Regions:
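TM-adjacent membrane-interface loops and short helices in multi-pass inner/ER membrane proteins
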Residues: 231-274, 278, 285-289
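Hydrophobic alpha-helical transmembrane segments of multi-pass inner membrane proteins, especially
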Residues: 31-35, 43, 52-241, 279-340, ...
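Short helix-coil transition/hinge motifs at the ends and kinks of transmembrane helices
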Residues: 13-16, 47-57
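A juxtamembrane structural motif centered on a specific transmembrane helix
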Residues: 1-20, 41, 332-381
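Helix-boundary and loop/linker segments of multi-pass membrane transporters
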Residues: 18-20, 48, 152, 156-157, ...
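Transmembrane helix boundary and interhelical junction motifs in multipass membrane proteins
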Residues: 175-181, 257-262, 272-274, 291, ...
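Gram-positive cell-envelope targeting signals
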Residues: 1-42, 193, 205-212
């Protein structure tokens, strides 16, 4: 027995040998996106912020605070061995489910724009749906890592995805777009474990049916669909926001009007610092600036693919795939909405749009990815 233990410890040491690795490329891309986001946030919000808050730097100051707060979990998670979180996957899922339910409890949950999405504890407000995204990543990575071979069976896939139904339903009641993102994350992680096309086509059809059912049940969502299909005749605020956003994109031309020179941000594009910030980027920096930003996101996704492909174990690879899926889906949804390719959903642009909870948890997810990258060992040449 002692001999076996010595051999296993030697094998472990052998596996750990090699040059320690840390993906500074990923870190620099994230830092650049955050800095670029601060510049565009100030540009898009200075006018309305000066009128509403008597301080043109109001949103900029809050975003800097959010980024500083986000650095704490990012650095912490980057330094802690990611394998530690494997045993907390189910706990994270249950906590996120409870938090999402608390949104509907009077005096705890708070509403904005007709949706209950926040929990208020004194002066602090946060979105439990952001907690749910990272919780689902941890939960799915844990489950798939335990039964990787069983994912070849369709029934096993259905059972795992069925475990997420309570959380998806609770989130979808107040925030359908986040529910779609959670489903997308789960499906992408499952597809990596078992890339069988037929079973995922069946799941995709089920998701579409689920989304249509929720749209039909909620009147304001069906109104958004109608406004999306006929924006020129509908008279809702969402249509006005979309139309003004399209004007901003169209007026930017190839190279834009110049940084800070947007006209649509002067009260014409509502929430220009949030989910519509991409329209201001297009107006001020033009098609060239928009393409550069999209390429930067593609570079970010590519770095994550490299880390996932070289992770030391399946669990680490799944964590990175989950974060990568989250960011990719959110970028696609945001750009699709502002170009009127999809109905208005309120999905923000990662690292660029103004947001408290979203920025903090996005940076926490980046910390997880960096932790996985630290586990990679380069071969000695």
């Amino acid at each position: 027995m002692a001999g076996k233990r010595r051999r296993s410890s030697k094998n472990k040491e052998k596996k750990e040998k090699g040059i320690p690795y840390f993906d500074y490329n990923l870190l620099f891309i994230v830092i650049f996106l955050l800095c670029f986001g601060l510049v565009m946030l100030y540009s898009s919000s200075a006018y309305t912020s000066a009128i509403k808050n008597h301080d043109s730097m109001h949103y900029l100051k809050l975003q800097i605070r959010n980024i500083v707060l986000g650095l704490i979990p990012m650095v912490f998670l980057a330094k802690v061995d990611y394998r530690y979180w494997k045993k907390l996957g189910f706990f994270a899922y249950i906590v996120s489910l409870i938090l999402c339910v608390l949104v509907f409890v009077p005096k705890i949950g708070s509403s904005s724009h007709g949706s209950s999405r926040w929990i208020g504890i004194g002066p602090i407000q946060f979105q439990p749906s952001e907690v749910a995204k990272i919780a689902v990543i941890l939960f799915m990575a844990m489950i798939i890592d335990k039964i990787p071979k069983q994912f070849d069976k369709f029934l096993s896939l259905v059972k795992v995805l069925a475990m997420l139904i309570p959380l998806i339903i609770v989130v979808a009641i107040s925030n359908l777009s986040t529910a779609v993102i959670i489903i997308g994350i789960s499906v992408c992680m499952s597809f990596v474990a078992s890339p069988k096309y037929l079973q995922f086509i069946i799941v995709a059809v089920a998701v579409v049916v689920f989304a249509v059912a929720f749209v039909m049940l909620a009147g304001y969502r069906s109104t958004r669909i109608e406004a999306w299909l006929h924006p020129e005749t509908a008279g809702t605020d969402a249509v006005f926001q979309t139309m003004m956003g399209l004007y901003a994109i169209g007026s930017g031309g190839l190279f834009g009007k110049g940084l800070g020179e947007s006209l649509q941000k002067l009260g014409n594009v509502p929430e220009s610092q949030n989910d519509m910030i991409f329209t201001i980027i297009c107006e001020e920096l033009g098609l060239f600036g928009a393409i550069c930003l999209i390429l930067l996101f593609i570079l970010l996704i590519w770095r994550m693919m490299v880390i996932a492909n070289n992770a030391r174990d399946l669990y680490g690879s799944l964590l990175v795939i989950g974060v990568m899926s989250h960011i990719a889906i959110q970028v696609i949804l945001n750009i699709a909405v502002v170009t009127n390719s999809l109905p208005n959903t309120g999905v923000i642009l990662p690292f660029i749009s103004y947001g408290g909870t979203s920025i903090i948890f996005l940076m926490a997810e980046i910390g997880l990815v960096l932790s996985v990258s630290r586990g990679i060992r380069l071969e000695n040449v």
